[in-house]
Amino acid sequence: GDASSASSFAVDVAGFFQTEEISYNDFNGRWRAGFNLQNLGPKMSYDNTQSSTNFLPSNMKLGGGFDFILDDYNKVALNLEVSKLLVPTPQDPDLNGDGTITTAERNENNQNYDNIGWVEGVFQSFSDAPGGFSEELKEVTYSAGAEYLYQDSFSLRMGYFHENPDKGARQFFSLGAGFRYSAIKVDVSYLFSTSKVKNPLENTLRFSLTFNFGDQYDEY
């Protein structure tokens, strides 16, 4: 087909809060919480007509965690995150109630969807699932993770991600480890799927190498 350009813009809005270290009976601890609203912006426009616009993949993430600071050398971190797409669900109702959705009705439904503004769409995404509130909950993905950290230099990690089978069925565990020396950090992780649906990243081993310039680290 003919090449065409598209235009839009997007912003992210995020916040993070972490408490000071709190003393408990047998350990110290630290709470944290955060949010991230991603890709907020006008619909992607491929020309100047309303029918050639698409919603950006706006997304909301809410997370929290707690650090078990066992002593000067050992720390365990637990984290939980929920995520939801902030895009309205396309609707295709039977407008005249005769039991049949005609081409004219479908065109009207599509036009009604195209007329939804991006701000309206963000709010509408919380209440427009055809199956009601129970289906809205199915649109939420859940992630949980744990990390053991020794001397802020060596870490072991594990995590789990869950997406409802009706909404994509991505479900997988991950295992990982990390090592930091001076300004160099090496991380490795392995992902394996627990879903019947194939994941392109399942059974993959991933490495990352990070150089941190400007910060000072203790060397062990």
Task: Report each predicted region and the residues it spans.
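Outer-membrane beta-barrel porins/channels
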Residues: 1-220
